[in-house]
Regions:
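Alpha-helical transmembrane segments of polytopic membrane proteins
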Residues: 54-65, 147-159
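Charged, low-complexity cytosol-facing tails and large interhelical loops of integral membrane proteins
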Residues: 139, 146-147, 154, 181, ...
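Helical transmembrane-bundle signal
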Residues: 16-27, 65-72, 97-104, 108, ...
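Interfacial non-cytosolic loop connecting adjacent transmembrane helices
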Residues: 34-55, 106-150
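Transmembrane alpha-helical insertion/packing segments
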Residues: 1-62
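Cytosolic juxtamembrane helix at the C-terminal end of the final transmembrane segment
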Residues: 2-5, 12, 74-82, 108-119, ...
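Structural motif marking the loop-to-transmembrane transition
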Residues: 1-11, 58-59, 81, 85-88, ...
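Loop-to-transmembrane helix junctions at the membrane interface
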Residues: 72-101, 105
């Protein structure tokens, strides 16, 4: 059990930091394939509003990513990655990383699936033809790589959150054992 705790303490903050940074980058790049929808002048209704409709999801993911990065730095700053005896700050920061990991993963999954469903309704062939007719070399892919990346990232975020809760439980068990051993020595 100590080896698992030691491993998670040592690497969880770095893995979480990388995943939360990737979430922020993902949020920034999520709508990139359809940014050109804002300038589309074709006859299909709803295309120009498609891009704006998903900006709130991008904003939410970006805010989650930024807040999660701050919480992960707090985890590291409270020395949750090296303390052998656990104090309340260790438990709070560990639980916060777990909550943010799971919340970010679920939010990313929902946002990606909704965005993909909306993307599937776009008249991509007509849009590509419109830009070709107007002398632009802009094209929209029928299935951009952003969707599988979103699903993979969401699973990784949830797994990081679960790992943080496992670490929380291991720290709690270690703290209980520590308190019992102190009581045994006092008697």
């Amino acid at each position: 059990m100590e080896k698992i705790t030691s491993f998670l303490q040592k690497w969880l903050w770095l893995i979480a930091l990388i995943l939360f940074a990737l979430l922020a980058v993902f949020a920034i790049s999520m709508a990139t394939p359809t940014a050109v929808c804002a300038s589309y002048g074709g006859p299909e209704p709803g295309v120009t509003t498609f891009y704006q409709a998903y900006q709130s999801a991008n904003d939410a993911l970006l805010i989650l990513g930024a807040c999660s990065i701050v919480i992960t730095f707090l985890f590291k700053r409270l020395r949750s990655s090296i303390r052998p005896i656990y104090y309340i700050g260790n438990f709070v920061s560990c639980a916060a990383v777990g909550i943010m990991g799971i919340a970010s993963g679920v939010t990313t999954l929902v946002a990606t699936s909704r965005y993909q469903a909306g993307y599937a309704t776009l008249p991509i062939d007509a849009m590509n033809q419109y830009w070709l007719d107007h002398g632009s070399n802009v094209t929209i892919e029928k299935s951009p790589a952003i969707f599988p990346l979103g699903y993979i990232l969401s699973v990784c975020l949830v797994l990081a959150g679960v790992a943080a809760f496992v670490l929380f439980a291991l720290k709690l068990i270690a703290r209980i054992r520590y308190e019992k051993s102190r009581k045994g020595e006092a008697e």
